[in-house]
A protein has these predicted regions:
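Active-site helix of classical SDR
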Residues: 43
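Residue(s) in the substrate-gating loop at a strand-loop-helix junction
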Residues: 27
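C-terminal beta-strand-loop-alpha-helix "lid" module of Rossmann-like NAD(P)-dependent dehydrogenases
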Residues: 60-109
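Single conserved hydrophobic/aromatic residue that forms the stacking wall/gate
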Residues: 1-8, 12-14
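Active-site loop immediately N-terminal to the catalytic Tyr-X3-Lys motif
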Residues: 32-38
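Helix-to-beta-strand junctions that scaffold the AdoMet/dcAdoMet cofactor pocket
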Residues: 14-17, 59
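Core catalytic loop region at the nicotinamide-binding pocket of NAD(P)H-dependent oxidoreductases
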Residues: 65, 103-149
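Hydrophobic alpha-helix immediately C-terminal to the catalytic Tyr-X-X-X-Lys motif of short-chain
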Residues: 46, 50-58, 68
Length: 165
């Protein structure tokens, strides 16, 4: 709710000036999820939907809405998610898969891009006179392009192979 509340405050102020820009920070998980990240992906997917709707709704007021979709970024997020995965790893049914997911995530975040890349992407989205609706950045973000061109079954197989073996 805090995102919506802040956006509403900005819209009231910027609508009168007939210019302004909202930059929402999402994740590639908003467009595709991996095993073990369903709830996180759902929250990011919701932010993507809100951003798309706002972009359409606010256009006539001269307001722009931009979405930044980072891939794997070295932020320490893996330490937070590791706690959840470790709790699930004790389950006799889900445990073996969650251990493989945890190993996959740890490897991915180790190879992740720097947070500075996201900061530069946000700055670019703010500074350009004609921003794109979406900006991808960071490791694995190119997967968003690939996902659009292959059948769902093949995509699922690729994700499963990379995350749960």
């Amino acid at each position: 709710h805090s995102i919506r509340r802040r956006q509403r405050q900005m819209c009231i102020r910027d609508r009168e000036r007939r210019r302004g820009r909202i930059v929402n920070l999402s994740s590639i998980a908003g467009r595709f999820v991996t095993p073990g990240a369903g709830w996180y992906g759902a929250s990011k997917h919701a932010l993507e939907g809100i951003s798309d709707a706002l972009r359409l709704e606010l256009h006539s007021f001269g307001l722009q809405v931009v979405l930044v979709e980072p891939g794997l970024i070295r932020t320490g997020f893996e330490a937070v998610s590791e706690v959840s995965l470790q709790q699930q790893s004790t389950d006799p049914v889900w445990g073996p898969m969650m251990c493989r997911v945890a190993a996959s995530w740890a490897d991915g975040f180790r190879r992740g891009s720097s947070p500075e890349l996201v900061a530069r992407t946000i700055a670019s989205a703010l500074e350009t006179s004609n921003p794109k609706p979406r900006y991808r950045c960071g490791k694995e973000s190119e997967a968003l392009v690939l996902q659009r061109f292959i059948p769902t079954e093949l995509w699922d197989a690729l994700v499963r192979r990379r995350t749960i073996g």
